[in-house]
Amino acid sequence: MKKHILYALLLVFVTSFSATAQKNRINGIKFSRHHFVDTVKIKIWDGAVIIPVEINGQTRHLMFDTGAEFGFWIGDEEGWMKASGDTISVTDSQNSRLKKAFLTFPPIKVGDVVIENYPMVVDKGMSDYVCDRIDGAFGYDLVARGLSFKFDTKDSVMIVTDRKNYFSKEEKGQPTLKYLRCHKTRPMVWVRFPFGLFKLVFDSGAIGGEIDLSEDFVSRIAHADPEIRQKLDAITVRKDTTVITEAGLFGNSQDSVSYRTLHCPEVGLDNLILKDVWISTDKRLSKIGSTILEHNSLIVNGNKMHLVLLPHDGKMVQHVGNENKKGLKLLLADKNDTLGVLKAVVRKDGEAYRNGLRSGDYLESINGVLITDYCTYLDLMTEAMEQHCVFRTPEGTRKEVEW
């Protein structure tokens, strides 16, 4: 079952405020050292980078999220956080919009470097989905402030520096994704598809995501150019309607959407070629997700305004082969649903359908462990290799499936 019925964590902000306010807020951040290079041991969660830090005398874990313009904290506001006086209108990944206050955090120690006056938005909307794996995230504002990072996702090490050319030797000849900062200051990079060259958000906070295209985006470009429409139709293997669920900072949503499945013989990221890529257009945002970092380390160079991928095996051609042949996704049930925690969405051409599963069936247990909450499921999906799953229909019929 593993990643093919993966939870969809979209830790993404889309924000709107004046450039002057953004500049003043970034310039208020201070670092305890200058002209430094520091190495920090990190954790990798499904391609996402998790950084241990010390805040208020405790070890916390912050994800590095290139898809977020600024930092955010998942949980309740606590006494050691201080109001900064600045507010912002924030729209999260599922289009929920709220006006939030920036809170200034006490000094944050990352390795031997202390970050002072770092502001974050605080909300507990994601608490049910991260299951204590992370406490929050650093946003892309640290790069805008002049820091560069190397995330060695093979050996789980991060190098952070304020030296402008520190990574120059490592970057030579490697896949380089140059970007322009839009007004949201998130990295937008060029990606080559069989139907053209398009710019996507590089979002390291989209946990478990490879390459996502929204149906709105695909339909728009197909409508505008008959040649692109013809190329898209040539690689479209399925059109259907499905249920999607997305978790944002301010809650979660479910919706039925039209989508298509694209089978791309190859996708290009500069001179890195991804072969046999399957893309579903049932997401709201078009982006590259964290799964790219399961096979490639990453240099984030804010001074040169580019991202550099470092393939773990040194090869510039990588086989992805991410087709979901099982045709099964699991979505969180409503909190007041007394029949179960996770419900199946089953596609008719997949293995799950042939094994008797149907949309609306509830996942009861995995390897004999009852699924009573989302975090239990998440732990089992992380640990288990072969799984014996028991589902039940809303009427109570029991179904057993081996994955």
Where are these regions (language model features)?
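Bacterial Sec-dependent N-terminal signal peptides
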Residues: M1-I26
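Pepsin/retropepsin-fold aspartyl endopeptidases
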Residues: T20-W403
